[in-house]
Amino acid sequence: MTVTSPTEAFPAPGPGGWRRLADHFPRALTAEYQCLYASTCPPGMASYMERYGVVARTLDVAVVRGHLYITPVPLAGPRESRRSPPRALVWMLSRLHPAFRRRTRAARAALAARPWRAVTDHWFTVERDEWRRRNTEVENVDPAGLDATRLADHLRACHRLVTSGYLRHFELHGDDLLPVGLLIARCQEWGVDPALASGALAGASRAPHASEVSGWMLVTGYDLDCLTWNELGDTAGVAVPGHPHPVDLRQHVRAEHHAELAVLVADACRAAELRDDNGAITGAWPMGLLRRAMLAAGDLLCPADPTLAVEATVDELVSLLTGAGGLTRVELDRRRRQRLADSALDAPPAIGPELAIPPLDALPRPLALIGAAQLAAADHMLGDGHPVGIGTDCYTGRALVVDDPTVAMDAFEPGDVVVTAATSPSWNTVLAHAGALVTATGGLVSHAAITARELGIPAVIGDPTACRRLRTGATVTVDPINATVVTLGD
């Protein structure tokens, strides 16, 4: 049940306009995950933004009532502006300010050399195997057989792995998201709608073979309270058995742009493949290993309910295991109850003033194009509060409104319209037999949108009222062309 919250319950955590990452985190976050995200996202994003000439220093991160919010940190000027800066000022600043001049050079070099290609090649030929070896080394240590001192050491090792993995994941966003944003941004300049442009990515996601999937990968979400494949029982749902048909955009773009279009589509498809692959290996797998170690600590410290351990930070668990004291079970239980209460709140999608985007056409062309790509990637990952459609055919069927994939497996009937807040890989088994998909969060390049394209099922993504408005058992029509979901008989 979602509890409507007054605006004052979610005060702005700082200057600027803050957007909630609801598609990734529909619930309030654990204490350790809050620390992890805040320590890795800003430096990782700053690295790629500097490398590729993005007109921002980084993303800042804040947690309000347990919910994660982000805001861009401007390259120069105040953190908060109530209106877009004058075009003449942007034109002058971008050509005279040393920071803008450096970013323009970086953007020009990136657009000429397209370095994300080399990064992607290196990932699949070298770096991927290195990360798999690192993960396997940690996985081969069974925490259940360790005494308290050795378990504390293992927790530290898991924490180091997770921290380095998340940092690398954010650094790679310049390579696994910007090319997708470039495709969408250029297509918009050619008059092609983003929903149509993103259809060219169908089939790009790499479906891993079951032998490549560790049972200790987190799969029902990103936080430490989520389950691994081993806890679900098997990895049968990891692959999406679809038959996608990518959209041929050439018929929508003038012939003189076809050569550039081919490059953009190829780069975006490789980027989508990189994003899905590195997210599992640098994020889901290390996080699952950390969860396993924390639950082992819970077996020693609170055997009546080992899952309370995920409410602690790694440092707090290490202190308890090494005899330094600290948290009590009462405090862990209080944290859990508070997190569940915060999860039930209707956290606003945005806090503070609307982001004041500078006029991109006042920037030097390389800076403007990279800026448009960054905005497109961000907007179509998170969504903008307006639903978007995937597919071309309407579908009518029984609605199943559910927020847990394990519950969905028991209640699901083939052909159902699955209605949920957001999806993760654990939904794949259900969605492979669904008639359509509706989510309350996300955009054109969210996990839900990608999965719908791979499966060839119609979807409406990012309808913020869907989970409240629709009811299980009702007959609904999903119309991806108009991005609407209607209950028949209303």
Each model region followed by its residue ranges:
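Short, flexible coil/turn micro-motifs enriched in small/turn-prone residues
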Residues: 61, 216, 384-386, 392, ...
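Phosphate-handling DNA/RNA-contact segment within nucleic-acid enzymes
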Residues: 368-415
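Contiguous hydrophobic, helix-prone segments at protein termini
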Residues: 2-388
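Acidic, glycine-rich flexible loop/linker segments
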Residues: 1, 399-416, 421-490
